[in-house]
Curated annotation (Swiss-Prot):
Cofactor: Zn(2+)
Residues the entry annotates as binding Zn(2+): H136, E139, H224
Family classification: Belongs to the peptidase M14 family.
Leader peptide range in chain numbering: 1-21
Function as written in the Swiss-Prot or TrEMBL entry: Extracellular metalloprotease that contributes to pathogenicity.
Protein name: Probable carboxypeptidase 2
An example Gene Ontology biological process: proteolysis
EC number: 3.4.17.-
CDD domains tied to this protein: M14-like
Region (Disordered): 53-76
Biological source species: Arthroderma benhamiae (strain ATCC MYA-4681 / CBS 112371) (Trichophyton mentagrophytes)
Lineage: Eukaryota, Fungi, Dikarya, Ascomycota, Pezizomycotina
Length: 526
């Protein structure tokens, strides 16, 4: 079997981002708060004392939060809160990233460690944990739960010390400060920050990805909110009952041991912890299209352009954590923030309580993946099963289990696989591809000599274009035929070996049959 693959690409010149019905800034959704009947199913939880600015300093909350035109915590309020915590706690270090948002806003983050470690020089034999919120700017419980976690750690010094015996933690509470300013989902340029993890179209995505890559976490979480009022059923009179939806990374190119650790240890514990807090949960889902009258819900998918899977492809445990909040402004905000806090704390506590199992499983998984000769997975499918999903009737607030068809990705089933190449060859005319790979943490060796020899290549036999722009490109579906040929490439070409930790990110970026790829034309040899 020939082990090298040639990447010779032709640009399609697809033009710039086009997004319908969006303006520059303030792309805000309409607000539809819960009725009094529905709100009764989401009461305040007794004994809740959240240690974040929206709750400890309610006078700082902008008026617009009550009508869904603003979040609860301005940048300067958040930064002041973080700085005060860092001044009062030697194990908390306040940092500002050496890059800015698209509109020039800062990225403050906290580094928590009981030693003198840093992002570039982390503690040895400890877990590295990355926690982020505020990816979508109109999901305020995401970043607020991260601030509440910082406040909770400062208020519970013994618990913090117990955690930091076993881990270093980086908290980036606000991934998308421009989106938070405009209270909109998107970046300032109207790209979705959670759909840019393979294309890396925006510099902001690349900058944050490089920080993530330098830290190289064992565990990561991504805090979001989901739409509260979406209705289902023949009468459109039922909604999700859950306070929290969550999902591990699902891409099949993540080491199986790491995926099983996520599902069998972390996910099970998280569900129990949510229930113990008096809250409700279900797996993260989206609605699918079905030819039957039965509701089809799709479990979180495997797509690498989503942050959860992109982070997981660096061979780490990752969870998307969503709380019920989009579209209801400030309603139930304490309960929403608590839901996010409970999930984040559950992940940290599970890791510490099972430190040896977690650390050793992830480290073994990294080594196993790096040295693997198993096939790589390019496409997959989600088997459909029957199950129930927690719903709430909006007419009387009754809670019940609703029968659905469920497209599961725990696990997904591989459809198209390919033998794992020893390396990829990239001509010197494509340095931008190499720069993208380097952002992923993938090393590319520049060859001082010309390459002459056999390669395995893909001949593109058909290309079907989608009918509209998506995130700045026209997406395509391609068919290919595997060919072997001899090639000659000049000195200065790049060799990307696949026996490295982050090679799965090269697979999803370079293999022509995966999603969200590089441009090709029919009859290209790739």
């Amino acid at each position: 079997m020939v082990a090298y693959r040639l990447l010779a690409l032709i640009s399609l010149g697809l033009g710039s981002h086009c997004a319908s019905a969006l303006q520059y800034g303030y792309n805000q959704l309409s607000t539809h708060k819960d009725s009094a009947v529905v709100a009764g199913a989401f009461p305040a939880i007794n004994g809740t004392h959240l240690q974040s600015p929206a709750f400890t300093s309610p006078g700082t909350v902008p008026r617009g939060f009550s009508d869904g035109t603003s979040g609860p915590t301005r940048d300067e309020t958040m930064e002041g809160f973080m700085r005060r915590l860092a001044r009062s706690n030697s194990w908390m270090a306040y940092h500002e990233a050496d890059f800015k948002s698209e509109e020039g806003r800062k990225f403050p983050y906290m580094y928590l460690s009981a030693s003198n470690s840093s992002v570039e020089n982390p503690s040895s034999h400890k877990l590295r944990v990355w926690l982020q919120g505020g990816v979508h700017g109109n999901e305020p419980a995401g970043d607020q739960s991260m601030l509440a976690l910082l406040g909770d750690l400062a208020a519970n010094q013994k618990w913090a010390a117990k955690l930091l015996e076993k881990m270093d933690i980086l908290v980036l509470p606000r991934y998308n400060p421009d989106g938070v300013f405009y209270f909109q989902r998107y970046l300032a340029t109207n790209f979705d920050p959670n759909r840019d993890h393979v294309k890396l179209a925006r510099q902001q995505t690349r900058d944050i990805k490089e920080l993530f890559t330098r830290f190289s976490p064992h565990i990561a979480t991504d805090m979001h909110e989901f739409t509260a009022g979406r209705t289902f059923g023949p009468k459109k009179d039922i909604i999700y009952a859950a306070d929290a939806l969550f999902s591990a990374a699902k891409n099949l190119n993540i080491d199986e041991g790491i995926r099983q650790l996520s599902e069998k240890l972390f996910a099970k514990r998280m569900g129990k912890d949510i229930e113990a807090a008096g809250l409700r949960w279900d797996p993260y889902i989206t609605q699918g299209e079905s030819s039957s009258s039965k509701l089809l819900l799709l479990e979180a998918g495997t797509d690498a352009k989503i942050g959860r899977n992109a982070m997981g492809l660096s061979q780490c445990v990752v969870f998307l954590c969503e709380t019920r909040g989009i579209g209801i402004a400030d309603q139930h905000f304490e309960r929403r923030t608590l839901s996010g806090l409970v999930m984040a704390k559950s992940i940290l506590q599970t890791a510490v309580d099972n430190f040896d199992e977690v650390y050793n499983t992830i480290e073994r998984g990294i080594r196993r993946f790096t040295n693997s000769r198993n096939d790589i997975v390019l496409t997959d499918k989600s088997p459909i099963m029957e199950r129930t999903f927690g719903m709430l009737n909006i007419t009387d607030a009754s809670l019940f289990d609703y029968p659905i068809d469920f497209a599961t990705t725990t696990p997904a089933e591989a459809v198209l696989t390919r033998s794992r190449p020893r390396a990829y060859l990239i001509p010197p005319s494509w340095p931008d591809i190499v720069k993208r790979l380097e952002v992923f943490g993938v090393k590319a060796d520049k060859l001082p000599y010309s390459y002459v020899g056999p390669v395995e290549a893909l001949n593109v036999t058909s290309v079907t274009f989608d009918k509209e722009y998506y995130e700045g490109v026209v997406t395509t579906t391609v068919q290919t035929k595997l060919v072997e040929r001899n090639i000659r490439l000049p000195a200065g070409s790049y060799l990307v070996k696949t026996n490295q930790k982050n090679a799965a990110l090269a697979f999803v970026a370079l293999e022509v049959r995966t999603k969200d790829l590089l441009p090709v034309l029919i009859m290209d040899v790739y």
